[in-house]
Design a protein with these regions (language model features):
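Short intrinsically disordered terminal tails
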Residues: 1-3, 69-74
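N-terminal non-globular leader segments, chiefly Sec-dependent signal peptides
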Residues: 1-50
Length: 74
């Protein structure tokens, strides 16, 4: 999983945000995947936070989604 993090001021802040993003991405991925009979997008390739503060996950297929705090995707 490639995690993109911008705007942190300290190494500690970077590490905390990276750990949070990676854990949250795994949770969102598992939930999203559970709603498909056949998941065709592969594993997580890249994770980042967009300009509006939403977590974005790109999968091995190249497809990606935004996720809000409730776990909804679009």
């Amino acid at each position: 999983m490639h995690t993109v993090i911008k705007g942190t001021k300290t190494v500690e802040e970077f590490k905390k945000l990276k750990a949070y993003l990676e854990q949250r991405a795994k949770e969102l991925y598992e939930d999203h995947k559970s709603h498909w009979e056949t998941w065709r997008f592969g594993d997580i390739d890249k994770v980042w936070i967009d300009k509006d503060g939403f977590i974005c996950i790109q999968y091995e297929s190249g497809d990606w989604w935004h996720y809000n705090e409730e776990g909804e995707w679009w």
